[in-house]
Amino acid sequence: MKSLLLPFTLVAATIAAPAFAECTAPIFTVTVPDGAKATKEVMVAAQKSIKELNTAVTDFTNCLLTERDAKIAAGGDNLNDAARQKIAAEYTTRNNAAVDKLTKIADKFNLEVRAFKAKQPQG
């Protein structure tokens, strides 16, 4: 009888195991052009890349929130407040790192946009 229960137990454990999707951070490969030298087309292309990166960071944030909530829910009553806070902090740290990288790129781009506008003829 035990030999029959073991396979069913393994199947039940596998089905009940929470499936955590691994949230993959965006790849930050956007090159910010030199606004004093760049053409309008180059600046527009960089802006488009930054907008796409912003969307990727937003998607990453949403994935992290879903994964965090699933992990906390899977812990159920076995998690105390400290354990829940630790899980939340891990996901917050990952999210903040991505947002900080995006912010640095956006800030640099904004400086280069000012340089680009400054070189344009006044009319």
Predicted regions: what they are:
Residues 1-7:
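Positively charged n-region of N-terminal signal peptides that target proteins for export
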Residues 7, 11-18:
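N-terminal signal peptide c-region/cleavage motif recognized by signal peptidases
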Residues 15, 23, 48, 55-58, ...:
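Alpha-helical structural elements
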Residues 19-73:
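Immediate post-signal-peptide N-terminus of mature secreted/exported proteins
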Residues 67-123:
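Compact alpha-helical subdomains of small soluble proteins
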